[in-house]
Amino acid sequence: MSKYWSNITKDIEPYVCGEQPKNKKIIKLNTNENPYPPSPKVLQAIENAAKDDLRLYPDPNCDTLRKTIANYYNLSKEEVFIGNGSDEVLSLSFLTFFNPEETVVFSDISYSFYPVYANLYKLDYELAKLREDFSIDIEDFKNTKGGAIITNPNAPTGLYLSLDSIKQILEDNINKVVMVDEAYIDFGGESSVSLIKDYPNLLVIQTLSKSRSLAGMRIGFALGKKELIEGLNRIKNSFNSYTIDRISSLAAIEAIKDEEYFKECTLKVIKTRNWTINELGKIGFKIIPSKANFIFITHDTYQAEDILIKLRDENVLVRYFNKDRISNYLRVSIGSKEEMEIFMDKIKKIINKL
């Protein structure tokens, strides 16, 4: 710890990312990346942009990308905010809408960046305990003092919360912002975007990292009423006006436009997810129902951490969280069918030896 650090720097406990190995032979099922490449139209846009456009600053407002996303969701451009990945959008949203003296509510088992943001911005927060089956009790989000954030589908569980439940939470917090983090919504859930017209306190946050295969480009966005987006822009432009580079913006536009390719890839992930769930069930694993591109699994006989280590020895990475209530679970990203077949072969051999 350095004497030059501020008190905030000394006190903060940073988020820990999933491992990014250099070895290309490793099967990476630990960070919920898409196993399929971006649309060919995305790759062509990147090639074209790299020829001359890099000498110019990007559009600070990302107007063309905002229009593209707005058209896709039947919104206006003024109802779209673009950020450098959904993590930046989330961080700016915490700063824009939550006050230090008012308690924010989010689930005790959810995206572990939320408490990092809350601590960084000196926000009070309350952890709403999930039920035994990891479902949300919406009563825990009733009349919050400072607002709420819901991950839907939840991470790391993959459980989806119905739109009726989202509506109830919005109505119970009509004077506070409710954020719905929809990083994984495209793998089987129904988005809350349709509710924006009726709920001025709703902010929906999405990413192109998962379903559009652009994790390496860092494109996230928020959708909500104009006054919410104006607030986000005030904060963003107090940090950095140019958060999105030219190439990323052009790639994102083509990724949104190529609906056919998007549907093809997400359908393959969903089919492979269902196949993997079925195969794991045959060997005694319990799987939380998932609407994401990952599954959350446990076994009554074998310890999750032991399986984690053995899988790593076999060049297969999955995610383990050494936390209360979930320390005997593994989160497994859904890879290609071929990758998941290898995963199944490895895990069968491992549990036979444990």
Curated annotation (Swiss-Prot):
InterPro entries: Aminotrans_II_pyridoxalP_BS (IPR001917), Aminotransferase_I/II_large (IPR004839), HisP_aminotrans (IPR005861), HistidinolP_aminotransfase (IPR050106), PyrdxlP-dep_Trfase (IPR015424), PyrdxlP-dep_Trfase_major (IPR015421), PyrdxlP-dep_Trfase_small (IPR015422)
Pfam family, one: Aminotran_1_2
Record's keyword terms, sorted: Amino-acid biosynthesis, Aminotransferase, Histidine biosynthesis, Pyridoxal phosphate, Transferase
Assembly behavior: Homodimer.
Keyword Amino-acid biosynthesis among record annotations: yes
Top-level taxon: Bacteria
Reactions performed catalytically: L-histidinol phosphate + 2-oxoglutarate = 3-(imidazol-4-yl)-2-oxopropyl phosphate + L-glutamate
Protein name: Histidinol-phosphate aminotransferase
